[in-house]
């Protein structure tokens, strides 16, 4: 009985604190585009003494879906989830990669039922199962069954920031005559040819696990982004952590390099 009472009190305090944080947020200065670098899944699995690393990836994916709901509640327009980098594809062992691909495929199916989904990355080196899942997302998005106010979710899968910029420049070089290139290679044209072409850059980038680096994530688009680093591992991310990040952003005065 004592344990149940303690849990009830703890849950009540948590709800009150979440409501307090929400009240501190300047709703007139919310980010239009939030990106989340989902990190720490493997460390979480080891910390929790799980038999399989995939348990950590599965828990992290579940928390990513929670994160999307939290963003949707605040009417944030665009959310980008960094799920699988090119380095992950090269460096993870086959079993872990196979498990991770299955987790991501399940996540894609779940997210695409509710929100508009874009793939941000290259399909070139992706496992066939994952590539097929992303192709299915393209088809479902074309049916235009989402409302105009539906949040857009970018899934960064098979992503590398350096590769993205390189590919954008190649597109430009292959599009225009050589003599026109000096005038055509501008910031605006490069931005338009990135995976995220046509979308706004992230206003706020959140990273879990205590690491304070970008890990090749959107080096071009993050020039004027605000950053918020969390000690919590991906699966341990809480709504109050999210609300603190949004509160912090909402009261910052952004300089945009000035």
UniProtKB/Swiss-Prot annotation:
EC id: 2.5.1.-
PROSITE patterns xrefs: UPP_SYNTHASE
Requisite cofactors: Mg(2+)
UniProt keyword annotations, A-Z: Magnesium, Metal-binding, Transferase
InterPro entries to which the protein is assigned, alphabetical: UPP_synth-like (IPR001441), UPP_synth-like_CS (IPR018520), UPP_synth-like_sf (IPR036424)
Gene3D superfamilies in UniProt: Decaprenyl diphosphate synthase-like
Binding site for Mg(2+): 39, 226
Residues where substrate binds: 40-44, 52, 57, 85-87, 92, 207, 213-215
GO BP: any one term: polyprenol biosynthetic process
Keyword Transferase: yes
Family as reported in the entry's similarity comment: Belongs to the UPP synthase family.
Protein's job: Catalyzes the condensation of isopentenyl diphosphate (IPP) with allylic pyrophosphates generating different type of terpenoids.
Name the record gives this protein: Isoprenyl transferase 1
């Amino acid at each position: 009985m004592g344990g149940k009472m303690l849990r009830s009190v703890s849950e009540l305090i948590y709800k009150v604190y979440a409501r307090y944080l929400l009240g501190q947020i300047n709703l007139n200065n919310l980010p239009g585009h939030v990106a989340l670098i989902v990190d720490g899944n493997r460390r979480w699995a080891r910390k929790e003494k799980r038999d399989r690393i995939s348990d950590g990836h599965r828990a992290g994916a579940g928390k990513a879906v929670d994160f999307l709901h939290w963003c949707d509640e605040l009417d944030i327009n665009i959310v980008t989830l960094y799920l699988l980098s090119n380095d992950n594809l090269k460096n993870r062992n086959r079993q872990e990669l196979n498990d991770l691909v299955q987790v991501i495929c399940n996540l894609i199916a779940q997210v695409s039922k509710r929100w508009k989904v874009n793939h941000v990355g290259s399909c070139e080196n992706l496992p066939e199962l994952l590539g097929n899942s992303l192709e299915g997302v393209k088809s479902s998005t074309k049916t235009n069954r989402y409302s105009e106010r539906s949040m857009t979710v970018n899934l960064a899968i098979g992503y590398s920031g350096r590769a993205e910029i390189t590919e954008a420049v190649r597109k430009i070089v292959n599009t225009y005559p050589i003599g026109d290139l000096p005038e055509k290679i501008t910031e605006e044209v490069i931005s338009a040819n990135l995976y995220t072409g046509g979308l706004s850059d992230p206003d706020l980038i959140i990273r879990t696990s205590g690491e304070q680096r970008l890990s090749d994530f959107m080096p071009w688009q993050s020039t004027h982004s605000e950053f918020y680093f969390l000690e919590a591992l991906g699966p341990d991310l809480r709504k109050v952590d999210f609300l603190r990040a949004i509160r912090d952003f909402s009261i910052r005065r952004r300089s945009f390099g000035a």
